[in-house]
A protein has these predicted regions:
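Non-heme di-metal
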Residues: 1-100
Length: 100
């Protein structure tokens, strides 16, 4: 469970960082489009880091279930973490789309 907590917190941190960078991009947009695009790219990288952490967490749960049997509780926790991430990520993605 400590790994689930650790990786969940790391994923939230990545989303918060992505939000910070996309906000910086929005502010820089009017004064320096090139810098704004750089901040958008950094925000995308932060979300990619979150995706990698989610993959690691999912593999951890799968390994746990291989050793201990299928666990509804573990799947519920994984789904809950994914739901939280999705809810937090949605406004970041919406802001990113304004740069497309």
């Amino acid at each position: 469970m400590d790994k689930i907590k650790k990786y969940s917190k790391l994923m939230i941190d990545e989303i918060l960082d992505a939000n910070m960078y996309i906000d910086m991009a929005c502010k820089a947009r009017t004064s320096n489009e090139e810098i704004a695009e750089d901040f958008v790219e950094i925000a995308k990288q932060e979300l990619h880091h979150k995706d990698i952490l989610h993959k690691v967490l999912k593999e951890y749960v799968e390994d746990y279930e291989d050793k201990n049997g299928k666990s509804v509780e573990m799947e519920t926790i994984l789904d809950f973490v994914a739901d939280i991430n999705s809810d937090m990520e949605a406004p970041v993605i919406a802001k990113m789309k304004t740069f497309e």
